[in-house]
């Protein structure tokens, strides 16, 4: 078994797979890099930048990967009655978690996920100006794409881990340590043919105008301050990744929605976790 590691998606991505599959790992990393380029909030040539700059109501050509992620985002937006919203870019720019840029005036971007229309597999229309940030879902999609590539290359088993958002497949149990909000690993779960994602924000906050803000946004576009970790197990990493954000804001709702997506939440406490 070998493990390869690359910086990507704002974290480090590790791929563990059997010896002799180095070329497959390279192709998987290339798929991850493609997702990063297309869905970056920061890069001027990304699909998000094109949607941000487009005239409201204009059809915009984007990568099919971007369409797939936006389609899932819309589905989750409806399933959570609007709580999961990928147009939180305006809030994150205001609190300093995302760069403002020279052209961004926050009052010019009032749109929400319900204003996004999927035209076809390569075209999207935003009916109001908006700042889309896919940081709460794209990493999971990138992990899923890497797994698809590895399988297409004939790799029998592998683990793809993007900073704690991971997916495992094959005939083995992969031991996965769950890192709590304070950075300690107190619980290890076996991962077999599933995806696992965790979120917390104890170490990722800013003081803005006299109050703490985090990267996780809940009801009323307010920051969610969580001193605990939430962990979701699902069949796909895109679902696991997104549902951790919902669970931080409303655990009861997340548990209800998880049932619709063949997922489940792990019970957590300040010192560990249990099924």
Predicted regions span which residues?
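Mature catalytic core of soluble alpha/beta enzymes
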Residues: 1-275
